Amino acid sequence: MIYSFNNDYSEGAHPRILQAMMETNLEQNNGYSLDLHTDHAKELIRQEIGREDADIHMITGGTQTNLLAISCALKPYQAVICAETGHINVHETGAIEATGHKVLGQPTPDGLMTPALIQKALDWHTDEHMVQPKMVYISNATEVGTQYTKAQLEALSAFCRQKGLYLFLDGARLGSALTSPAGDLTLADIARLTDLFYIGG
């Protein structure tokens, strides 16, 4: 058998998920995330992150989630700072910039953003005719396979709050990061240290 690690969605669902779907297949539920199963899932997530006040939405994919989060959080003249290798800068076919929000990709040696890299972008964008950086986008795990430690995320969070920037964590590979032996972050840490994040594979 050949195993492909190209992505986390090349196969169907786990047999237990398929079984649960079969058991509820003939239930009649409201659409648009207004069903009891979605409500239950949201409650489980709130418990896991320790935030009863969390606003949770079910979105169909990573690009759509990135697009919604960034376009809802930013004003038309504001921009998002990310690693040069960041998914929104490289792989989403201009989806973010199509909404009018400039993506400010910063060169990094390891795909990780730091306060110093963010400060460089802030220092460069001071002219009144330039976009105003208002959000920092990070991925965990990153597009090059590195991960943020709790200390690194705490430093980013403190810096962003000091500078009045939103911190958004792309969780397309969050499942891999959270289960990695090298990781020391929990979902509760991420919920506490970021303004927006999502849970992917």
Functional labels for PLM-detected ranges:
Residues 1-201:
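Conserved PLP-enzyme active-site core in the AAT-like
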